[in-house]
Every structure is written in structure tokens, then in C-alpha cells.
């Protein structure tokens, strides 16, 4: 029998790089700080948040390697994945020795699925090599993510077996892999310090859709009906800084893209995403506030838009260990408000291991991890 536990589903999307990319940035430091990053990201993770930050580095920074950053978010508010798995097991047992109790329990599970909100899963992977210089900072990177939405469609048949067999799950997914180079440089303009960044990038966009019976549903089969599109895009970034104080603007995916699905006539819209940030990035503490100026559209036919306000804080113990916390709010109310936290370990300022998690209520959680080397 197919086991589709939350842990297995989460692992699938972290370990499937062929299906990755888009608005979700895999970065454990950012994740621990409420997914902020427009002014608080470092030169190594700048392409994930604001390419201008590649120019803001320390004098002893010569090269950085991010290998890799991974992350996953799962939103299964009504435990739909577990209910599907339980219903599949229970139906198999009913086929052998049906009992009124088993049929009643199967109906209860179907009722639970009928009332459940769609399951949403995001997963990401990022890699980067950064070489900062006073002439031009360069960051070669690859990043990607997949986001999946699964919604049960339960039959209204009065016969338990017929109701189960006639029920279905509708699944839609979007994936994108990006390969790019982030270029940035600092300037002094009118006695004020600025940094500008640009990221030309190549994108591989993919959509997946399917409608399958509840009995045959397996979330690992999300990529059975693939439509792909290759395209060019660009990110832009601006940062102002004075000592430890910063303000910034990031514009992701300057050129709007859309890609249709093979089934169901869905269209995924990858729209420009503008975010502003302000913060303080010091030696021992960092504070950041990011606010989306635009909505993230996603599937045109679905009410799945998001627009976030995020806050984060980091305490740094002499460059050897970090403690982080944050909070994010979706102004569109499609995702619940989330509390985040994380830790970092960076002995000798050469190896950095970052771990982070988020929580937004029962069955709504996320996790991320980074491994980086700086020389």
C-alpha cells in the first residue's frame, strides 16, 4: 500500500531537482528570520533575495560556496494526506471482510476529505559560488523549486464503496529551475552609498496536472503530465547602506511568463515580484523587515495569490554561532501566519551550517538547511 506521510512528501520535493524553482527561495538563514532577505542576505545568498547585496561583503571575503541550501514547506491543515492513505488501506480491508464499523469509518474519512482545504507543498534547492571584488562582484548560481496543490473531489454517492471508487483527487503543480549569474557593484552617489545588482538567468518552467481516482492517488506521481517551457528572465536589485543600516528594493522575474497545463486548462503566471526591505545588519545583531509590493499570482484559475510582510532578527555570538527568529503574514490570507526560528554554527568563519524551521499551526510547517564555505 502507498504510504504518503507528510515526511515522505516533504522529502520528495527536496530531493527532486528536475522539478524545482520559482518564488520559494531555499535559504535556511532567511527561513529562520521570517524568510526576509532583501537587506539581510549576505553576498553568497544575494541572488536568492536581492542581487545588489553581492557587493556588500567583508574585507576578508574572497570566495564563498553554498553547497547546498534545501527547504520544504507543507500546508496540510486538515490532514488530507493521512486521510487518503487511511482510506486506501481501509478500502482494501473492506474488500476482504466488510463490516458496518469499517464502512462507517471509511465514510468518515471521505467526509473529512470532502471538507478539507487543498494541500500545498513547496520545496526548493539552491547552489551558489560567489567571488566578491571592488570592481564587480560575481555570483554563479542555480536555484529551483516546485509547488504542488492537491484537492480531493469526493463523490456524493450514498453507497460507501461507490462513493470511494467515484471520488478523485485533482492535482496541479509548477516547477522551475534557474541558472544565472548575479553581477553587483557599490557606488557613492552624493555622499550616499548604494549598491546595484542585475541577474540575467535562464529558466526551465514546468507544469503538471492530473485527475486520478482516490484509490489510485499517489502524490509521487505528480509529474505524469508535464508541459515545459524554456525562457530568459532577469532580476534587479538596489540597496542603500550607511554603517549597519540598510534599505533595499528587489524586483524578481522582470519579464512576465505564463505556461499552460496539459490537463484542466490551467495557466500558471510567473509575474514580476517587487519587495522592499529595511534593516540593521551589525556584527552582533541583525534586524530586517520585508514587504511585498506586488501579489504573487501563481495559477490564474485558482485563488492562491500571496503577498507577505516579514520580520526577522538574528543574534550573532562573535561569528561562531547564531540564533534567529521571525514572523511572516500573508495579506491575502491564503496561508496562515507563520513563526520561524533557526540556529547557525560557523566555526572559524569558514564552515557555516544553518538549520531553520517554521510553524503555522497543526500540519503547517517548514524546514530548511544550508551548508556553506567562505574563504
PLM-predicted stretches and their roles:
Residues 20-375:
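Subset of outer-membrane beta-barrel
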Residues 1-29:
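Cleavable N-terminal export/targeting peptides
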Amino acid at each position: 500500500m502507498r504510504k504518503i506521510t507528510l515526511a515522505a512528501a516533504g522529502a520528495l520535493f527536496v530531493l527532486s531537482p528536475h522539478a524545482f524553482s520559482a518564488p520559494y527561495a531555499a535559504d535556511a538563514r532567511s527561513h529562520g528570520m521570517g524568510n526576509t532577505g532583501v537587506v539581510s542576505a549576505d553576498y553568497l545568498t544575494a541572488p536568492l533575495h536581492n542581487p545588489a547585496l553581492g557587493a556588500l561583503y567583508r574585507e576578508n571575503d574572497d570566495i564563498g560556496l553554498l553547497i547546498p541550501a534545501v527547504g520544504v514547506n507543507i500546508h496540510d491543515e486538515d490532514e488530507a494526506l493521512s486521510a487518503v492513505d487511511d482510506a486506501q488501506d481501509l478500502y482494501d480491508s473492506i474488500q476482504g471482510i466488510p463490516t458496518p464499523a469499517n464502512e462507517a469509518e471509511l465514510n468518515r474519512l471521505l467526509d473529512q476529505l470532502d471538507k478539507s482545504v487543498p494541500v500545498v507543498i513547496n520545496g526548493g534547492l539552491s547552489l551558489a559560488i560567489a567571488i566578491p571584488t571592488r570592481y564587480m562582484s560575481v555570483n554563479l548560481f542555480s536555484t529551483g523549486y516546485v509547488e504542488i496543490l492537491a484537492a480531493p473531489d469526493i463523490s456524493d454517492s450514498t453507497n460507501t464503496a461507490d462513493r470511494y471508487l467515484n471520488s478523485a483527487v485533482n492535482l496541479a503543480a509548477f516547477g522551475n529551475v534557474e541558472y544565472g549569474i548575479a553581477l553587483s557593484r557599490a557606488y557613492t552617489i552624493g555622499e550616499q552609498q548604494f549598491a546595484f545588482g542585475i541577474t540575467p538567468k535562464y529558466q526551465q518552467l514546468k507544469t503538471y496536472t492530473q485527475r486520478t481516482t482516490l484509490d489510485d492517488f499517489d502524490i509521487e506521481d505528480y509529474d505524469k503530465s508535464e508541459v515545459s517551457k524554456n525562457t530568459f528572465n532577469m532580476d534587479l536589485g538596489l540597496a542603500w547602506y550607511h554603517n549597519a543600516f540598510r534599505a533595499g528594493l528587489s524586483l524578481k522575474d522582470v519579464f512576465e511568463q505564463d505556461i499552460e497545463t496539459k490537463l484542466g486548462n490551467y495557466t500558471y503566471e510567473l509575474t514580476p515580484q517587487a519587495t522592499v526591505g529595511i534593516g540593521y545588519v551589525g556584527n552582533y545583531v541583525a534586524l530586517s523587515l520585508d514587504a511585498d509590493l506586488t501579489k504573487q499570482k501563481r495559477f490564474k484559475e485558482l485563488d492562491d495569490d500571496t503577498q507577505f510582510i516579514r520580520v526577522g532578527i538574528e543574534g550573532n555570538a562573535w561569528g561562531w554561532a547564531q540564533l534567529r527568529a521571525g514572523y511572516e503574514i500573508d495579506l491575502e490570507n491564503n496561508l496562515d501566519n507563520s513563526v520561524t526560528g533557526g540556529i547557525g554554527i560557523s566555526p572559524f568563519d569558514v564552515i557555516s551550517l544553518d538549520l531553520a524551521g517554521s510553524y503555522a499551526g497543526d500540519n503547517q510547517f517548514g524546514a530548511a538547511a544550508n551548508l556553506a564555505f567562505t574563504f
